[in-house]
């Protein structure tokens, strides 16, 4: 025959698959699981081993003769077990130890189902159980097989005694006692059910335990007599209670179960020892004393029947339901108690939302929705939507409402509706005019004086003299910072002076100074007289309607003629008081300080006549005199306060920028917290460099200032985009002409904003035919890397005025071949750019005849062409000159020389009166007496 599976062989032999696998492994047969195959020889070996083990573990057939005999045997076994204690088995069959095997009990024995474990008892008679034996599953099929074998060879009573099948009755008794007895102290299964429902469900039909008998209880819970110990320490049932042995039910000792009811589910009995390492399934059971004999457990089939009837130890049994029901009832009682307590407790009243009164007037904006109106009216949006629905208007809470709908809703509520008027906070000019016209709480203020005049007429010298005479007296450190504006004190009265440059490029700065000034001091040199910038300053002052005080300077110089200056100024409407006019003339010498105090007195006199006043209690407004980008402070602006008082921390909008005044510095370089009217200060804290002559206004809060500044910046950007020239049919021809023009791209960086504007204006006025200046970027501050990058991308020239490039910018410029020109004098910057513009024009060339040659002889040469021999009649002829062949006054050919020789040598030049030989490149039709003109193209300089 062929091979057979392990599970087929186990089925034939009525044994467990695991028993067959264990025997096969002991015999050295390779099997892995119940699906492994064995041949006939291996099958015979396993059969023989099964027969030997069945015969070896069967107890004597006379083991159950008398109870007294069993008691003696049990006593002997107790003595023997005390000498060699080992872990006791938790299964229904208590296995014998090594001492019992040594006695070689030869009595007939029935086949036993389980592998016996070694049993130990302590000195007080308690049995020590092993964890591994308590939880070891048991096969029902094996139990049936063993029982059938025992019936074949022995009586039913001996068979039950040998295999320990009395546990069925014991288990039933325990189950009955669990269901009927309210005292749980001795009820092992009931405690076990309450604490380990899940584990009982898994191991109901697989575990067999040996509970400890309780003293003084000779009968079971149902009144039946307890089984007595037979021969070999085994229990024997009465004949009437013998049943077919089934798979045994797991029963715990009573005392262990009572402890387990108070422990977590995962705990094990603490009095445990490891099970024996030897294979104990087929060893002989050890005798147990009668006092410590375990209660017999019921078979698995009986337990299954009990489970179906609702009894037994199953999770679906009666006792388990009873235990769970008690817990459920306890929870029910607790829940009902809590519910009654909650009902009897006083209920807290829910806070009611207070109805806020309606406003007297609804200030609305067109486009508001129901949510926005609900916040103003203190009503829910749903209420407003319902009202509008009743009024015939269908809207939702996010829909914008028009003016009529909002007024209709206000009328329904019985309140007035008023549309909110928006003010353009970004219109600084309007705010500036309103603040300047404020006539409340006016107080006298210092006059603002602007000094104007031509270059080198002594304006700066006069200011320096005023500062050193009236400012630095009593100042320890002197002037620490130059901000272009100063205050001079005379007789406890202050005068504010503004300096303006005299060069023609600074027209805007002069006009700006005239706009913000109260009095103009016109400085005219007595030796030079009236100059172009003097006339321009007069026009600016007259346009601003500012009174003019003429200071005739340099009267100490030889050749000075103040009267001639006065005569010249009368042509422009400046008539001296001595001549019947109203213009004040003061003859001074700024270098020596002559008549300086007289000039100051005249200024104060004119200020008294003007009655200059301002309100220091309102929000400050003023004008930017100068602005720059400081390396450490950031954007810095020099401003002149014209109305109100400027405080540190005020939210401010300056031109198209905004910020908060972080710090203020006066003309002495000292920090101040307040700036009164007519006081020049330098402020920091703005986010960008403003333009000169920009207005500044202080706002109530920073949020409004930010909104106004951002709006102004946005409008300025849009305006700049609008200024871009778009091509139309009207300007198409002009655009095409401009496209033919060459451009010089320039980037301007200067120290102050006024210099930037002056230099840009001067460069744009340079007139070179065919070339124009294109300023692609202008800013305040040092030349940085971004400027160099922009110049490299646009092929532009960087012009720095009183600034220097950073180290990184300089290195990058050298790497990118960017031209950086640094200047401190505006004349030189303008001249250099003008020269560059002229150099960008395409050069103009004109022809110049340098010599003539008369052909005397022609010699045709193969592979060379016609060789000409002749004399230089006039001038000279060079190798790289152009030639023109003229025959009878008609130009036959114009080209280049192919070669030029004198005798056999190649030469570069042949002068007049010398013979030569030459060839004309790519031309051979040359005849005797032809004239050859040599000429060159020379570049004509740009005028």
From Swiss-Prot:
Residues 553-556 are annotated as: G4. Residues 57-76, 142-190, 289-299, 315-330 have a biased composition (Low complexity). PROSITE patterns: G_TR_2. SUPFAM superfamilies: Initiation factor IF2/eIF5b, domain 3, P-loop containing nucleoside triphosphate hydrolases, Translation proteins. CDD domains: IF2_eIF5B, IF2_mtIF2_II, mtIF2_IVc. Residues 35-359 are annotated as: Disordered. Keywords: Cytoplasm, GTP-binding, Initiation factor, Nucleotide-binding, Protein biosynthesis. Residues 130-141 have a biased composition (Polar residues). One of its GO terms (molecular function) is GTPase activity. Residues 478-482 are annotated as: G2. The keyword Cytoplasm applies. Residues 331-342 have a biased composition (Basic residues). GTP binds at residues 453-460, 499-503, 553-556. Residues 92-103, 110-124, 191-205, 239-250, 259-271, 346-358 have a biased composition (Basic and acidic residues). Pfam families: EF-G_D2 (PF22042), GTP_EFTU (PF00009), IF-2 (PF11987), IF2_N (PF04760). One of its GO terms (cellular component) is cytosol. Residues 453-460 are annotated as: G1. Residues 499-502 are annotated as: G3. Residues 589-591 are annotated as: G5. HAMAP family: IF_2_B. Belongs to the TRAFAC class translation factor GTPase superfamily. Classic translation factor GTPase family. IF-2 subfamily. This is Translation initiation factor IF-2. It comes from Lacticaseibacillus paracasei (strain ATCC 334 / BCRC 17002 / CCUG 31169 / CIP 107868 / KCTC 3260 / NRRL B-441) (Lactobacillus paracasei). The lineage of its organism: Bacteria, Bacillati, Bacillota, Bacilli, Lactobacillales.
């Amino acid at each position: 025959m062929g091979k057979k599976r392990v599970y087929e062989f186990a089925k034939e032999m009525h044994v467990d698959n695991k028993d067959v696998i264990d025997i096969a492994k002991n015999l050295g047969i390779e099997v892995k699981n119940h699906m492994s195959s064995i041949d006939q020889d291996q099958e015979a070996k396993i059969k023989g081993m099964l027969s030997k083990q069945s015969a070896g573990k069967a107890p004597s057939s006379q083991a159950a003769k008398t109870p007294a005999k069993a008691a003696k045997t049990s006593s002997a076994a107790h003595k023997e077990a005390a000498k060699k204690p080992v872990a006791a088995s938790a299964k229904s069959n208590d296995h014998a130890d090594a001492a019992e095997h040594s006695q070689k009990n030869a009595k007939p024995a029935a086949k036993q189902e389980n592998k016996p474990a070694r049993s130990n008892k302590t000195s007080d008679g308690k049995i020590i159980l092993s964890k591994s034996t308590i939880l070891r599953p048991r096969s029902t099929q094996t139990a049936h097989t063993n029982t059938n074998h025992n019936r074949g060879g022995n009586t039913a009573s001996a068979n039950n005694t040998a295999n320990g099948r009395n546990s069925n009755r014991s288990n039933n008794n325990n189950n009955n006692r669990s269901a009927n007895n309210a005292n749980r102290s001795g009820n092992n299964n009931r405690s076990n059910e309450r604490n380990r429902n899940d584990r009982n469900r898994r191991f109901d039909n697989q575990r067999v335990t040996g509970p400890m008998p309780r003293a003084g209880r000779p009968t079971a819970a149902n009144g039946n007599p307890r089984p007595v110990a037979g021969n070999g320490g085994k229990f024997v049932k009465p004949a009437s209670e013998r049943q077919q042995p089934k798979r045994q039910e797991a029963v715990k000792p009573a005392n262990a179960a009572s402890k387990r009811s108070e422990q977590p589910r995962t705990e094990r009995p603490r009095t445990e020892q490891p099970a024996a390492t030897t294979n104990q399934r087929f060893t002989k059971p050890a005798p147990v004393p009668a006092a410590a004999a375990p209660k017999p457990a019921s078979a698995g089939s009986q337990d299954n029947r009990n489970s179906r009837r609702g009894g037994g130890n199953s999770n679906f049994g009666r006792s388990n339901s009873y235990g769970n029901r008690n817990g459920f009832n306890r929870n029910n009682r607790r829940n009902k108690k809590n519910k009654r307590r909650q009902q009897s407790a006083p209920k807290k009243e829910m806070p009611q939302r207070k109805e806020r009164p309606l406003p007297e007037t609804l200030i609305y904006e067109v486009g508001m929705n129901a949510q926005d109106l609900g916040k103003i009216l203190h009503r829910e949006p749903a209420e407003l939507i319902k009202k509008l629905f009743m009024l015939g208007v269908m809207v939702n809470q996010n829909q914008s409402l028009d003016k009529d709908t909002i007024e209709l809703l206000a009328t329904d509520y019985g309140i007035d509706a008023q549309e909110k008027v928006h003010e353009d906070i970004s219109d600084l000019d309007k705010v500036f005019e309103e603040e300047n016209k404020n006539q409340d709480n006016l107080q006298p203020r210092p006059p603002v004086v602007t000094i104007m005049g031509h270059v080198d007429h002594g304006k700066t010298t006069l200011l320096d003299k005023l500062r050193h005479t009236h400012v630095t007296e009593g100042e320890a450190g002197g002037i620490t910072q130059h901000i272009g504006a100063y205050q001079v004190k005379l007789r406890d009265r202050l005068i504010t002076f503004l300096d303006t440059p005299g060069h023609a490029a600074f027209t805007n700065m002069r006009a700006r100074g005239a706009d913000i000034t109260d009095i103009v001091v016109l400085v005219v040199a007595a030796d030079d007289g009236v100059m172009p910038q003097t006339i321009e300053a007069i026009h600016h002052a007259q346009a601003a309607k500012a009174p003019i005080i003429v200071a005739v300077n340099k009267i100490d110089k030889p050749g000075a003629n103040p009267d001639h200056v006065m005569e010249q100024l009368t042509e422009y409407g400046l008539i001296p008081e001595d001549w019947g006019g109203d213009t004040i003339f003061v003859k001074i010498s700024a270098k020596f300080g002559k008549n300086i105090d007289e000039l100051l007195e005249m200024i104060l006199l004119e200020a008294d006549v003007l009655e200059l006043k301002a309100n220091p209690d309102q929000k400050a407004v003023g004008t930017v005199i100068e602005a720059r980008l400081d390396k450490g402070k950031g954007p810095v602006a020099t401003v002149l306060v014209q109305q109100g008082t400027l405080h540190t921390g005020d939210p401010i909008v300056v031109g198209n920028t905004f910020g908060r005044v972080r710090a203020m510095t006066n003309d002495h370089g000292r920090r101040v917290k307040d700036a009164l009217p007519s006081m020049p200060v330098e402020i920091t804290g703005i986010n960008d460099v403003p333009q000169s002559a920009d207005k500044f206004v202080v706002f109530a809060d920073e949020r409004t200032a930010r909104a106004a500044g951002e709006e102004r910046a946005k409008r300025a950007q849009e305006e700049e985009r609008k200024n871009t020239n778009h091509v139309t049919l009207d300007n198409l021809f002009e655009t095409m002409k401009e496209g033919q023009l060459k451009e010089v791209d320039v980037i301007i960086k200067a120290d102050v904003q006024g210099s930037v504007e002056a230099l840009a204006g001067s460069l744009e006025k340079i007139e070179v035919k065919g070339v124009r200046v294109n300023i692609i970027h202008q800013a305040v501050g040092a030349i940085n890397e971004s400027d160099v990058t922009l110049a490299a991308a646009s092929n532009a020239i960087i012009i720095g005025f009183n600034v220097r490039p950073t180290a990184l910018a300089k290195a990058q410029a050298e790497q990118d071949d960017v031209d950086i020109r640094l200047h401190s004098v505006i004349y030189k910057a303008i001249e250099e750019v003008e020269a560059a513009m002229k150099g960008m024009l395409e050069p103009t060339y004109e022809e110049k005849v340098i010599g003539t040659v008369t052909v005397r002889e022609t010699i045709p040469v193969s592979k060379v062409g016609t060789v000409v021999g002749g004399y230089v009649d006039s001038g000279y002829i060079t190798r790289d000159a152009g030639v023109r062949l003229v025959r009878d006054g008609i130009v036959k050919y114009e080209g280049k020389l192919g070669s030029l020789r004198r005798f056999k040598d190649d030469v570069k030049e042949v002068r007049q009166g010398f013979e030569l030989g030459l060839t004309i490149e790519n031309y051979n039709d040359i005849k005797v007496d032809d004239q050859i003109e040599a000429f060159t193209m020379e570049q004509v300089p740009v005028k």
